[in-house]
Design a protein with these regions (language model features):
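Conserved alpha/beta-hydrolase catalytic His-Asp/Glu region
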Residues: 127, 148-196, 202-203
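Flexible "cap/lid" loop of the alpha/beta hydrolase fold
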Residues: 103, 107, 114-144
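Conserved HGGG/HGGXW glycine-rich cap/lid loop of the alpha/beta-hydrolase fold
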Residues: 7-63
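Conserved alpha/beta-hydrolase "acid-adjacent" motif
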Residues: 220-226
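Gly/Ala-rich beta-loop-alpha elbow adjacent to hydrolase catalytic centers
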Residues: 94, 98, 102
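Active-site loop/oxyanion-hole signature of alpha/beta-hydrolase fold enzymes
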Residues: 52-93
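Short beta-strand/loop motif that positions the catalytic acidic residue
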Residues: 207, 213-215
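Catalytic histidine-centered segment of alpha/beta-hydrolase-like enzymes
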Residues: 244-257
Length: 265
């Protein structure tokens, strides 16, 4: 665990143990904070790669600059981290909002990315936008929690809740207690507003590295059609869907195995 200073901010990052397969840059999702355990550093990725993960601007133990944030800044932060670590090029995995940042990274700094994994994310623009999470901020905490669970997994309908009330209550309780560290509302909103303006659709055809696209079959945040739009636009890519919603990486154990195998191929 360490903090690196760039021109704009101090970035908090962590690495898993050294592995012969080399490093992998992991860019996490909305509201991510490495103090919440377990996280990507404890995933199957770290069995094969030296995973590098970091708190994005406004979150966790990274600086929280004044003013609005932009997707370009998020991408440049990732590139600056690589600069300070002395890494010229690296495989990158972006999940959800992190997938949007990864798209912007390969657009703005194409030479830094050797392979790209994009999970449960969207391109914006004509390729479709992810669910507007900023709209949930106007809801009460209970309403926001329930709505978030439902859009995370479209199988959770009102009918399902009626038939599985105990399981529903368990889901809500788990969601309430899952994250020890939560972002403050002001900086979270900055991230959500930047996310709202995300649009890399037209640049996807310029990506000249292999891309692995992964989605959840029941994801209401980054729906199937958004992943399919990216699949049609990116020249060299593979697309797979898994049993689960936005959290399919947890729900379907096959997903991480496929990611590792693809990265090693």
């Amino acid at each position: 665990m360490a903090i690196i200073s760039t021109k704009e901010l101090n970035i908090y990052f962590e690495k898993s143990e050294f592995k012969m397969n080399g490093p992998l840059l992991y860019i996490g999702g909305t509201g991510g904070d490495l103090r919440n355990r377990p996280n990507q550093l404890h995933s199957p990725l770290s069995d094969e790669f030296e995973v590098i993960a970091y708190d994005q601007r406004g979150l966790g133990q990274t600086s929280k600059p004044l003013g609005d944030y932009s997707m370009k800044q998020y991408a440049d932060d990732a590139a600056s981290l690589l600069d300070e670590l002395g890494i010229e090029t690296i495989p990158v995995m972006g999940v959800s909002f992190g997938g949007m940042v990864a798209q912007e990274l390969v657009k703005r700094h194409p030479s830094r990315v050797s392979k790209l994994v994009l999970a449960c994310t969207s391109s914006g623009g004509a390729g479709g936008a992810s669910y507007p999470l900023d709209e949930l901020e106007a809801l009460s905490e209970d309403e926001k929690l329930e709505r978030s669970i439902k859009i995370n997994d479209l199988r959770i309908t009102d009918r399902w809740i009626k038939d599985n009330i105990n399981a529903w209550n368990d889901l809500k309780n788990n969601a309430k207690t899952r994250l020890t560290y939560k972002p403050d509302s002001k900086n979270l909103l900055k991230q959500l507003i930047a996310r709202k303006g995300h649009n890399t659709y037209e640049s996807l055809s310029s990506i000249d590295v292999p891309v692995f696209l992964l989605g959840g079959k029941y994801d209401g945040i980054a729906p199937v059609e958004n992943m399919e739009s990216m699949h049609l636009k990116i020249i060299d890519n593979k697309l797979e869907f898994y049993e689960g919603g936005h959290l399919f990486l947890i729900q379907d154990k096959k997903a991480f195995k496929d990611i590792v195998n693809w990265l090693l191929s």
